[in-house]
Amino acid sequence: MLKRFPELGRNEQRGSKPRCHLLTDGTRAEVAGRLTGLVKPFGSVSKGYVWRPRGFERTDELQLHIQNRVIPLKVSRELQRWWFAVRGGASPNWDIVSQCSVGKGTDSKDGVLLVEAKAHSAELNSDAKSPAGASDGSQRNHKRIGDAIDEANVGLQRLTGNAGWSLSRDHCYQISNRFAWAWKIAELGVPVVLVYLGFLDASEMSDKGDTFADPEGWGRCVKAHAKGQVPEDVWEQPLQTSSGVSLIARAVAVRQALRAARMPA
């Protein structure tokens, strides 16, 4: 059977995955405009910036502990030391990552846009991190990851003066690691805009979970999912970290239709 998107796997032909590639497909000015829509009013994305994926040309999802062109190398190396006791593990995969400017005018700083995308409610899972393997390295990394998330949780509590943070390796691991990484990157001096992106009207995913009809419904869904881990009043609020740069968490919704079948070249 002909795949609609031959660059993607057979199980990646619908939902949020192809939409992320479609969102980053087009001229550099077009893509920069779309990504700016995820960041504004807190910042912008220029056409000269680096982002991944890059349409269907670069379909890889970045792990930020590995050297990349989006954040400084020294930050990637520090993230690796923070998250792993032993090299060789995998860190969170980001659906979209882009350089961005955070702030306005002369006060703007080079930052990073981190996107976690969803097309239906069942993608917002509350699972714990998978158990560690039998090897000593796996066990040590499992513990280190728990320690890193605990460190981020304490840091966010201090930062906001809100004891309502409850990030954990052992519950709601996905949203916990997303906020932990956003916090750590900002603590390392890189402003962060963390976007939970809801793709509206993904009707082809209705067999998997409830789809999202409007931005308000998506926002309610994200905040309900995050409740108990992330205080509701931190969304859309720039948080000033100890490094002097901002961390901003957002829930944003867009309509991105699946285009007609892409034919192989």
Predicted regions and their residues:
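Non-catalytic C-terminal interaction segments of nucleic acid-processing enzymes
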Residues: 171-265
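Short loop/turn segments at strand-loop or loop-helix junctions that form parts
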Residues: 115-121, 196-201
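Charged, often low-complexity linker/regulatory segments
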Residues: 1-50
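Extracellular structured ligand-interaction cores
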Residues: 91-95, 110-114, 170-172
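Short catalytic/ligand-binding loop motif for oxyanion handling, primarily in non-cytosolic enzymes
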Residues: 105-106, 121-126, 187, 202-206
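Active-site metal-binding core of divalent-cation-utilizing nuclease and nuclease-like domains
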Residues: 61-108
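Conserved catalytic cores of phosphodiester-cleaving nucleases, focusing on short active-site segments
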Residues: 96-98, 111-119, 178
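Acidic, metal/cofactor-coordinating or nucleic-acid-engaging core segments within structured domains
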Residues: 128-194
